[in-house]
Amino acid sequence: MHDVIVIGGGFAGVTAAREAALRRRSVLLLEGRERLGGRTWSGEWHGWPIEYGGAWVHWHQPHTWSELTRAGLPVEISDNAQLAGWYVGSERRSGSIDERDEIARRGWDRFVDGVAQALPAPHDPAAALGALARFDRLSIAERLGELPLSDEERDVLTAELESLAHAPLDDAGAVSVLRWHALSGYSLELTQFTGGRVTIAGGTRALLCAISAGAPFERLLGAPVSAIRHNADRVEVETRDGTVFAARAAVVAVPLNALGAIEFTPALPEDKQRAIALGQASRGIKIMIHARGEPIIQNSIRPGHPFGYLGTEALNGDGSQLMIGFGIDAQLCDAGDLTAVQRQLDAILPGYEALDATAHDWLADEHSRGTWAIHRPGWYEHHHAAMQRDEGRVVLAGSDIANGWSGFIDGAIESGLRAGARAAALVG
């Protein structure tokens, strides 16, 4: 019998395993995939290092920055775009990034009005829950509908919000974006910067390896968990092939949208079951396109497009470039259909030829069932505290239920730090 079993090998699970092992507990980590990393996944494509999932970090993210400092890992800051495109209805307009940001800022300032009072301490969403509830009850679309905006302001702001939400705006809660804004120093510019400019040299894999090397623990890949049985003394974890592992405590670091695939005995309390049934809203796509055209760093946004944000990530010496796009629904974009990708490219950033495209379908992936956490309306008022509560010897963890940077690597590390320490304490 192990002291602690950790279920899930993303950043939350690996951090929790390390923290329990540092406290001299024997730890077994079970991961359903044949790799660690969860919703981060470093790779290489056409000679470029790419991230199929989470990628960006920032010094405003304290847990991530502490781990980067500990590991001695440098970061890389991408160049800002030289040219920006945006759409008002079907009309494409272009100008400088500053010009488009000024349009976005006029709408953004109205969208976030009041958030400083609702989220005075962004790492503690319960600090002013009464004030936060007014926003928590709204979808992003409902919040947008409250605002007096010109057509241009509305379309630019809608496209910005779609790229952040990675979900249809009538399904995504306003607080997920408002929290991101608050954590970024209540600034549009920093909200954009924290989510898209700073990456880890060597990729997210380098940081994950550094954390996992921080203390010895066993790990078993390709071991999806189907059932968890727990009582006052122990936890039994059964994998899909029928193998049963036992421990004195367990950390379940599984994405919210995948938790429903695990059978708990005794059943989880009704408040947790309601939260799991609600899930989180993200269902988008992150697509990488190898394109040929004008060798300039630029991006374009268009509301309602299959990838409503598309921008240059890297230029190649042969005149080609790597573009990255984000869309609100993975089912609207098939990276394997280059003809469709070309048609969609022409409709947001014309003048480029799509040579190849790739993406991972996180929505279809049974181990994630979605991308970064974008909570639905009512999450913080009704579900957040319940999902952070222990159930006997079972501790839940993950970026989806973090207090701070939920949906980011930082939120996963935050949650893993807390869960690993808690599980070690439960062992005694």
Q: What do these predicted ranges mean?
A:
Residues V252-P269:
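Flavin (primarily FAD) binding-site architecture
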Residues A21-W45:
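Glycine-rich FAD pyrophosphate-binding loop
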Residues H2-L29:
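N-terminal Rossmann-like FAD-binding beta1-loop-alpha1 element of flavoenzymes
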Residues T15, R23, R234, N299-G428:
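Conserved flavin/dinucleotide-binding core of flavoenzymes
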Residues H2, R240-A249:
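Core beta-strand elements of the Rossmann-like FAD/NAD(P) dinucleotide-binding domain
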